Amino acid sequence: ALAQSFDGRYFLDHAQRDAAGELRPAGDISEIGQYYAALFGGLDLREPRYRRLRESITGDFAPGSGARDPRIVPVNAFIGVYLRLETLFRMGEHSLMLRDIEDFFGQMEAYTGTLWENRDFHGSYDHGFASYVASLLIASRQPPCQP
């Protein structure tokens, strides 16, 4: 699956069978798909072949970067932002993770003192799953685990 879906920069979201029954990549690419691959695909983003993907995760996909590839479907609050934060954490990019937490949740906290379900003014203004961010903040202050 990794070999079929990685195009040298991004992981394609899915494949479809052609008339002969062969699987062919459909060409759809989403930001969340990159995080799923990074977190659950058994790959090591430090490998040279994933350099461009790593650059996209740490740069192009960053909130407000303005460098986003127009083919990439961006993440939504749940679950995409959380997978982004977890990916940055596991990559050791704690300063980027902290910046993203501030960028995404800062206005929520300033407005209501809570973390919300969505980016905007609909849904829950005190969403339980948003507390996951606290676990990342605590973990980012701990020394790395030794394998």
Question: Which ranges hold each PLM region?
Answer:
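Active-site core of glycosidic bond-cleaving carbohydrate-active enzymes
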Residues: 1-147
